[in-house]
């Protein structure tokens, strides 16, 4: 799911458009739902304050995309959390490499 957020951010940077936090949230939620996961949260926030972002963000700005999900159908409740710093190309590449494995 975080790969979907990376894709939205990279597209905004490549075209010079502002990054829409709601578009990133939607991409995260759609990817998580497609994987059959129950979303606890899918958020886009300022990486320093961790305050959720509401308005457009310059395409070259760094923003934090964070998710938490539960895995349904398990005897024990499993909760997974992850995040990626959008705009930090090294962090984006790390995430994409991990997903490709």
Predicted regions and their residues:
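Glycine-rich, Lys/Arg-enriched anion-binding loops that position phosphate/diphosphate groups
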Residues: 1-40, 45
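Phosphate/ribose-recognition catalytic cores of enzymes acting on nucleotide-derived substrates
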Residues: 26-101
